[in-house]
Amino acid sequence: MVTPLNVPRDIRVTADEYGSPVFVWLGSRQRRVVRIRNVWRIDDEWWRQEIARRYFEMELSDGSVVTVFQDLISGSWSRQRY
């Protein structure tokens, strides 16, 4: 059996009025976003099941670096590990 790697996991995010993350929850702990390093968008597979995501690579108040994305169709947030 093949197990997918780096499957996105749902994550709780608080965004500002522009849609940029300002807080994320890792487990039960809230972390403040200190800096957004990179932002990019992926729009794909419109002919099947549309994918529209905005990704953020960011530094958090505990020193960790995480990548999250917002599904622009559903509005949900997920963490993507690399």
Give the ranges of each region predicted by the language model.
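Non-catalytic peripheral regions of nucleotide-handling enzymes
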Residues: 1-82
